Amino acid sequence: MLTTMRRHGIRLALFAILATALTAIVHQLTTRTIAHQAALQQQRLFDQVIAPDGYDNDLQRSCLLLRDPRLGDSSAHRLYLAQRQGQPIAALVETTAPDGYAGAIRLLVGADFSGKVLGVRVQEQHETPGLGDKIEIRISDWIDSFRNKVVHGAQDPAFRVKKDGGEFDQFTGATITPRAVVNAVRRTTLAIRDIRPHLASLPRCGESK
């Protein structure tokens, strides 16, 4: 009787060990797959903002943290530094337009250190479907109107929607959304321009300072 019970106990213990090991292996493989897919998706987004042949470093491994009120809030924002032959040439910054019609709009803005916008993409928005959501590249190409535009200062009259005397189209029935994005792109581009001499002082992502 005791021998039979011991055998059952050993079998149950072995089964539990095998099940735990299998679960751990599956979890590890799944985690790696998810991380790999997330990295691919992030790189595809980067490629839409800055030309891949314009830099020669790994953007995802060149992440710094930038605090600047021009980025929409007081939190630390990710800055991905593009380099060529070891020299900084541009940056991609995750920024926020806090004054969208339906709340904050999260953007990825790429610019060089002379104030030229390289590209912009929307990362998250909750604007009105059919109106404000035209900032999304899958709906319209409006967001590409920033490409290669130069910001000449905080009061640059061209970097406004046409209703405010600037160069950028607003949407029919939705002026607040494009105005918020234009203003955020202008502010973020200036933040990128101004940070060039201070890059060495920025903490890397994952660090605190």
Swiss-Prot record:
The chain crosses the membrane at residues 9-29. The complex is composed of six subunits: RnfA, RnfB, RnfC, RnfD, RnfE and RnfG. SMART domains: FMN_bind (SM00900). Its main location: membrane. This is Ion-translocating oxidoreductase complex subunit G. The modification FMN phosphoryl threonine is found at T175. It is a single-pass membrane protein. It is found in: Cell inner membrane. Belongs to the RnfG family. GO terms for cellular component: plasma membrane. One of its GO terms (molecular function) is FMN binding. Its EC number is 7.-.-.-. Part of a membrane-bound complex that couples electron transfer with translocation of ions across the membrane. GO terms for biological process: electron transport chain. Keywords: Cell inner membrane, Cell membrane, Electron transport, Flavoprotein, FMN, Membrane, Phosphoprotein, Translocase, Transmembrane, Transmembrane helix, Transport. NCBIfam families: PRK01908.1, rnfG. Its cofactor is FMN.
